[in-house]
Each structure stands twice: as C-alpha cells, then as structure tokens.
C-alpha cells in the first residue's frame, strides 16, 4: 500500500499541532509506522486519503457500534442540522436519550449529559467527593478514566500507597488523594480500605479493562468491589465509557449482574459525535446543581446533534444485536487461535461482548502486569503487515478491537486470512 498523501499531510500537520495530532495514539509511534490520514468510511470499511481500503476494527475507538455512516443515524442528523447545531437551552432530544439510557442502564435513575468521557469521570468524582464528604478515590492499575489530573495517577511503591503523578503537570497534592491498586486484586483493595477507608469517597473501575487490551474481571471481582464499598460507605463507580452498550444490552453492569452507585458513559451513546454522561441513584444525582450545591455545567452539554446521533444509535440495538456480536466473536477468536498455533506463535484472546483483545504471550492476562508481558516488537510487526492486508487495527497493544453490526462473516474470514498471511511473512 502507498501512503504518499498521508506522509505529506503529516509533514504539514507537524507544523500545526503537537506531534501532528490531536490525540497521541494517532501518531502511530508505538508501531513505528507513518500516521494514516482517513478520508471516509462506509459500513465496516474505512478509506484513507491515498485510496487504501481497510476492514475497520478501531471504529473511532469504539463509538461506531453500527459501523460508519449508518443510514438511520445520518438521515436524522441531516434533519437535526437543518434545525440548528446548538441552542444553549434544553431540547426534547435530551429527554429522549436520557429516558433510553435510564431504561437500559440498571444503576441510572437520573442522568446528566456532558461532552466527553473525561468530563463524565471528572464530574463523577466531584460528585462522589461532595456526596460523601471524603477526599480519596481508589482506581486500578491499567484502567484509564480520561486525562483529568486526579486520574492520571500511577501506583506508588508497594500495595495501596498514595498515588504519584503519571504526567508532568499533575500536582502531587492532587495525586495524594488517588490510590492505585492492581486490577482484579480484592486483597489489595481491602488493604487500601483498612488504611484509608474513612476517607475513601469512591472506587472507580472499568468493569472490563479496555485500556490494557481488554481484560475482563475475574469471577467475584466486581461483586467483591460492591461488598467492600458498601461496608465502608464508599461509592462504587463503573466507568462504562468504553463498555457501555458494548458488553451487553444493559451494559457491563447488566451483563455481570453487579449494580454500581454511579456510572460514567460515552463513546457509543454519541454514535460518533462528542458526548459523555454520568448517572446513578436519584438521591445522589440530586446533589448536582441546580438542585444541589455540587457544581457542573457545559456549553455544549446535551447538544442536539450528539443527542440525535446517540438516540438513533441506541434505538437500533436489541438483545439480538449482542447474539450477533457473540457469533462473530466466536469465529474471530477460533480463527486467531488456529492461525497462531499454525505458526507456533503464542496468543491470548480476551473477549467481552463486541470488545476483543489479543496478547502475544502465553497468558492468562488478568491484570496490567500480565498484559505488559505481550511481545510488543512482534505486535508492531503484526500491525504493519495487517495494514498491508487491508485490516485497520488499533496501533497499540493496550487498546481493544471492536466489532460493529456492519461487520460480516466475510469480513471476519478475510481478517483471519490476513493474520495467516501476515504471520507467514513475519515468522521465518
């Protein structure tokens, strides 16, 4: 494949934007390949400015659960645009999407719309602290909750130590109120609560860790979180920005049967437009302004275009949708295992609904330490070869791949064949 136009575009972009991008992963640095500039998408396919076609498993990092340019979504967006892009006042569209979210997400009795997943998690932590009157938040190693200061925190030395900044610019004073423990480790969480329980406002977790390459919870982990937070009077917060409506019809909390106090949403609920949301029990949500004294606001929150795209996306999802995803996922997982075994290359495949992660190691992968044992050099080689075969994968080992309703069995079979061809070139 030729990337001449993309390479030329990147040279210009680098003079205009830091690293030439507006989000770091788009620079493709971890796979040592030129950034690809996209032109358009249709269904399960995406096309770059050089005219190359790819089967798309990135799907804008998850939001496009119906694939690109879904006709129903696009048609209603045209209607919404004709009425205006934003009004700074409420619209009926907000009621429609809010009701749909409340109907489908077990924990949500009231919801507040925002403009991004990061905004949703940031506001949720403020609400948790304001509601409980406590300061500290527990998060898990390898889970990503957006780029707000209090969540860009890595673990300190030892179990349940106070956090240290994970990026320059994050003050240590903020970091000290975030505790990081290993994912899928209830014993570590218990130690954290034994030390700091009286000042822990909440525990935030991706119910399926999608930002270390798709790592599901082990048996009993989520219920254990529910039990421990209840015991200490802390709030359990599910960050379902990625898992929301991808793991199941009632999100990950419905799939696993564990109900948090608060839930963060994003990605799928905007259908490709900028949106986020957070919600939970009425008694907690009513502490948000204007009913309560915990402040939150946003110029474009609940804007009519995002509400339209979100509603028209979610309204097309049914329980049968997830049966279709499971069928495609079964074929892809079986094919990956077969092809990698053929070439004597170890692989671990993790799945959760329409989210799939693969690690180039023996496995299992249940936490960040194990995810880090994947062969990153081989992953980068694999990425480059798969792009040549017309398959667009996330350019990072620590991002999940996604399925859409637009993907077909033929797409999956072509993808499996592409892996076989790629491995034939890599493994000598």
UniProtKB/Swiss-Prot annotation:
Origin: domain of life: Bacteria
GO cellular component: cytoplasm
Pathway in which the depicted protein is active: Porphyrin-containing compound metabolism; protoporphyrin-IX biosynthesis; 5-aminolevulinate from L-glutamyl-tRNA(Glu): step 2/2
Alphabetically ordered keywords of this record: Cytoplasm, Isomerase, Porphyrin biosynthesis, Pyridoxal phosphate
Catalytic reaction annotation: (S)-4-amino-5-oxopentanoate = 5-aminolevulinate
Listed InterPro entries: 4pyrrol_synth_GluAld_NH2Trfase (IPR004639), Aminotrans_3 (IPR005814), Aminotrans_3_PPA_site (IPR049704), PyrdxlP-dep_Trfase (IPR015424), PyrdxlP-dep_Trfase_major (IPR015421), PyrdxlP-dep_Trfase_small (IPR015422)
Compartments it resides in: Cytoplasm
Disulfide partners: none
Residue numbers carrying N6-(pyridoxal phosphate)lysine: 267
EC code: 5.4.3.8
Names of the cofactor(s): pyridoxal 5'-phosphate
Molecular-function annotations in GO: glutamate-1-semialdehyde 2,1-aminomutase activity; pyridoxal phosphate binding; transaminase activity
GO biological process, one term: protoporphyrinogen IX biosynthetic process
Family: Belongs to the class-III pyridoxal-phosphate-dependent aminotransferase family. HemL subfamily.
Protein name, entry field: Glutamate-1-semialdehyde 2,1-aminomutase 1
Natural source organism: Staphylococcus aureus (strain MSSA476)
Gene: hemL1
